């Protein structure tokens, strides 16, 4: 269906002494696709693992702000995201980091995993490791979409969305998001669901204002 852009602006008063520079906020709902259900048999290295008929990770989107003034902030020192291997899935299977951010890939299963990616934005291979071994860590120094796989269990698939902007948030399972402490100005806001489904709108953010922006389904 045709996307409708709904922007409701609520002007709020600034507290005394508060800076208006990064005092805008944006919230809304992304209409998400239905969850997927998978069943697979993996047989490698002399082992056979059958995945039960259960839902994968619930659908989610990453909502982020693009524009000239969104690339100034750097990742916070020590911030490390995690994408675990659990129940033969990447959990969560979608995360976002700012360029220069790090991600750990802990193994929480009772079997070997081997996390790797051949994506242009980041190529890596962490090798085989078990639950009781140190989790591999990767620094993502180039923006782009990084698709993550397990070399042993080929049904496993995850995505690391590496962004230049520090202004992003992953939605909850119902599609809700909220971005706070945003700069005022003219920006493009994108909702990334997968490489085939990226929705975007243009928004003018005002200092001290709260705006609502929804992303209906296609």
Predicted regions and their residues:
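Bacterial N-terminal signal peptides
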Residues: 6-15
């Amino acid at each position: 269906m045709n996307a409708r852009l709904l922007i409701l602006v609520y002007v709020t008063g600034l507290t005394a002494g508060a800076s208006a520079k990064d005092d805008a906020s944006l919230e809304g709902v992304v209409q998400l696709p239905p969850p997927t259900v998978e069943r697979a048999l993996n047989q490698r290295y002399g082992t056979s693992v059958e995945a039960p008929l259960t839902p994968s990770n619930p659908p989610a989107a990453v909502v982020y702000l693009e524009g000239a003034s969104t690339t100034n902030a750097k990742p916070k020192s020590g911030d490390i995201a995690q994408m675990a291997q659990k129940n033969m899935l990447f959990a969560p299977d979608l995360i976002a980091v700012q360029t220069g951010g790090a991600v750990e890939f802990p193994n929480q299963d009772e079997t070997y995993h081997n996390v790797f990616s051949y994506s242009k934005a980041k190529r890596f291979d962490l090798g085989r490791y078990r639950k009781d071994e140190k989790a591999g860590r990767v620094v993502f120094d180039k923006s782009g979409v990084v698709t993550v796989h397990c070399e042993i269990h080929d049904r496993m698939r995850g995505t690391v969305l590496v962004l230049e902007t520090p202004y992003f948030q992953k939605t909850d399972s119902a599609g809700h998001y909220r971005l706070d402490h945003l700069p005022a100005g003219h920006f493009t806001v994108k909702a990334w669901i997968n490489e085939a489904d990226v929705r975007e709108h243009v928004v003018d953010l005002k200092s001290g204002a709260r705006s609502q922006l929804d992303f209906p389904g296609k």
